């Protein structure tokens, strides 16, 4: 399978490395035309306001709103996938959740935590950098993991979102889950 990583900002190379470790082809997505060539898309972290501006500038907002590609958002990628961002409207409206930006604090408050992520593993290393958390889920959203009482990982159908940065660790199981459990089944739907 060919998995794209939106290459406007964030740890693009690290995400591609995790895709390759999962046994698949990773490609940096810089133009909307490339979306036709991939089976799934990862929206990496970074700064969510900057990410939205760049997505507007290069035409990705409309293309991704209309797309049915499976998507996996990490940190800022989770924020842009949300239907609601606390205090403002959502952006891509893919995950029926309300997200609170920077809810774990500033850069100096960044931390790592071992996570029990439902359906993946009980020992996933989560790297949280100015991370958001999910305040509320709606509809058919499945909560996959929490830190204390804060939701940090969810899935809704073909969309996966996490507050942390799995790509900044050596553990590629979250990316592998996205590809094998979310992207792969959608390919059989196309046949």
UniProtKB/Swiss-Prot annotation:
PROSITE patterns documented for this protein: PDXT_SNO_1 (PS01236), PDXT_SNO_2 (PS51130)
One Pfam family in the UniProt entry: SNO
Binding positions (L-glutamine): 46-48, 101, 129-130
Domain of life: Bacteria
Ranges that cross the membrane: none
Reaction(s) catalysed by this chain's protein: aldehydo-D-ribose 5-phosphate + D-glyceraldehyde 3-phosphate + L-glutamine = pyridoxal 5'-phosphate + L-glutamate + phosphate + 3 H2O + H(+); L-glutamine + H2O = L-glutamate + NH4(+)
Protein name: Pyridoxal 5'-phosphate synthase subunit PdxT
Native species: Staphylococcus saprophyticus subsp. saprophyticus (strain ATCC 15305 / DSM 20229 / NCIMB 8711 / NCTC 7292 / S-41)
